[in-house]
UniProtKB/Swiss-Prot annotation:
GO BP terms in the entry: abscisic acid-activated signaling pathway; farnesyl diphosphate metabolic process; prenylated protein catabolic process; prenylcysteine catabolic process
Gene that this polypeptide is encoded by: FCLY
The protein's name: Farnesylcysteine lyase
Entries under SUPFAM superfamilies matching the protein: FAD/NAD(P)-binding domain
Species this chain originates from: Arabidopsis thaliana
Pfam family membership, one: NAD_binding_8
Keyword hit for Signal: yes
Tissue localization of expression: Expressed in seedilings, flowers, stems, leaves and roots.
GO molecular function: farnesylcysteine lyase activity; prenylcysteine oxidase activity
Keywords recorded for this protein, A-Z: FAD, Flavoprotein, Glycoprotein, Lysosome, Oxidoreductase, Signal
Length: 500
């Protein structure tokens, strides 16, 4: 959901239990020579990544001929990666931005020759305002002139303005983000040095990220000696935009949110959902669209999946790659996972013209292109941003709210509306500290849960990282007589693989 162009890249320099080795012992497995059937529930980046890595990592194992069935309850693939069309233009409505060090999704884009979309000049040069409900407590200058020298001067002025307001806390925040990113990069190390994890806690402890889930972002930033002013203003704006929540989210989710607001951000031209579509198409998957799985039952040595279409499927391995928090799937035997709520973000796209009077301004040019807000229940929106300018009186905007945006609110915010599109997303978990995690393995057999990792952080890349681990976990546990050979491990060593 993180799509708002945030022109604050100038602030950032950048943004253990070892359980099962790649050649580890296996449990359960194939008892005959027939190909195994792997069923994946959910076609988002998590589920499609599992399919992709299963195909790439099981070349010389008994799973290399596995049949992969994928079930998607909607009519298109992509999960929470969706686009919306407003007045003929396509915009990201779900998972929207990618970090320059999101190496799995970068590999997907390069592998399938997808086109990278970089921020437009208006996005990179947009002025930012922080609204407290009555006035702008922070307001930077926009650039984007035809003269690069003038743009540089404006950037320096904004630098100085923010430094005078927040001081050395800006540098401490940059260091906090960089340390988190460096730890996350351990998930791309060679497979020889990177274990397979059967629980989220072990995965986070190994990378040095677990302690960030034990305290809130506010507490972690206080430990890092950031000023309360910076936390209550700029950091709050970022967490409200990227996760729809306050600085009381867990420290790890907050750090990921901050990293998603720096420079070098990008997306896929035409929609990020294309990554999932390409992964599925190139992984020899039998795709069942518009088919909702309503029950998953373990029957002696296999799973039976039943759908709302009345169909039944026999599966040796089942992977749940959709949040179980708002999906009604009956499990037999029952499973036990911690209760978790999803944070709903209401996204509204409006083509029209913002009302400067709402912000106490006489001219629209006085209103920043991105308006973020402080944590105040009386403020009815999290942020408003210009997505596209057609003319001085005709633009497309994107608004995030925690509650549905009523017509009366939109009529206050806009002087004119020609088109309005509303979307309600169960976007990501409601983060707390300390976090409690569901297991990757939901039973004693082969029922796996990709979205257990979402309680650490929810992004397209973290879903791909979790999907890769699940694929390795399936291979290591499923095989009774075989394990990944040395040659296989060498072919996997980069974590980013070429099709065979």
């Amino acid at each position: 959901m993180k799509d708002f162009p945030i022109a604050i890249s100038l602030l950032f320099a950048l943004l253990s239990p070892v359980l099962l080795p790649c050649s580890g012992d296996s449990t359960g497995g194939v008892e005959d020579d027939s190909p195994a059937t792997v069923c994946i529930v959910g076609s988002g980046i998590g589920g499609s990544s599992v399919a992709h890595f299963l195909r790439n990592y099981s070349v010389s194992t008994g799973l290399n001929q596995a049949k992969i069935l994928m079930f998607e309850r909607h009519e298109i693939v992509g999960g929470r990666m969706r686009t919306v069309t407003v007045a003929g233009d396509t915009f990201e409505a779900g998972g929207s931005i990618l970090h320059p060090k999101n190496y799995h999704v970068k590999d997907f884009v390069e592998r399938f020759n997808l086109t990278v979309r970089l921020p437009t000049p208006i996005e990179e040069s947009s002025a930012i305002g922080i609204w407290d409900g009555k006035r702008f407590v922070v307001k930077t200058f926009g650039s984007g002139t035809k003269f690069p020298f003038l743009d540089t001067i404006v950037s320096w002025v904004n630098d100085l303005y923010l430094f005078l307001r927040y001081g050395l806390s800006l540098l401490r925040m940059s260091s906090f983000i960089e340390n988190t990113v460096d730890n996350f990069l351990k998930y791309y190390e060679s497979l020889e040095s990177r274990p397979i994890f059967d629980n989220v806690e072990g995965m986070l402890k190994w990378s040095g990220l677990y302690n960030l889930t034990k305290l809130t972002l506010q507490e972690k930033l206080s430990e890092a000696q950031l000023s309360p002013l910076l936390v209550n203003e700029l950091v709050t704006v970022i967490t409200r935009i990227n996760y729809g929540q306050s600085v009381l989210i867990s420290g790890l989710a907050g750090a990921v949110s901050l990293a998603g607001s720096g420079g070098g951000l990008w997306s896929v031209e035409g929609g990020n959902w294309q990554m999932a579509a390409k992964l599925i198409n190139h992984s020899d998957v039998t795709l069942h669209l518009n088919e909702k799985i309503e029950s998953i039952s373990y029957l002696e040595n296999h799973y039976e999946l039943k759908s709302t279409k009345g169909n039944s499927y026999k599966c040796d391995v089942t992977v749940v790659a959709t949040p179980l928090d708002e999906v009604d799937i009956q499990f037999s035997p029952t499973i036990s996972i911690p209760k978790r709520e999803l944070q709903h973000t209401h996204t509204t796209f409006v083509r029209g013209l913002l009302n400067p009077g709402y912000f106490g301004m006489k001219s629209l040019s006085d209103v920043p292109a991105l308006v973020g807000t402080l944590e105040d229940p009386l403020i009815p929106f999290s942020c408003i941003s210009i997505l596209r300018k057609y003319s001085k009186t005709d633009m497309t905007y994107k608004i995030f709210t925690r509650q549905p945006a009523s017509d009366s609110l939109l009529d206050e915010l806009f002087s004119r509306r020609t088109e309005t599109v509303r979307i309600d997303w169960g976007a990501y978990p409601k983060y707390h500290a300390p976090e409690v995690f569901a297991p990757f393995i939901l039973d004693d057999h082969h029922l796996y849960y990709v979205n257990a990792f979402e309680n650490a952080a929810s992004t397209m890349e973290t879903s791909a990282v979790a999907g890769e681990n699940i694929a390795r976990l399936i291979i290591s546990r499923f095989m009774t007589k075989e394990s990944l050979s040395s040659s296989d491990k060498r072919s996997c060593s980069s974590g980013l693989h070429s099709d065979s």
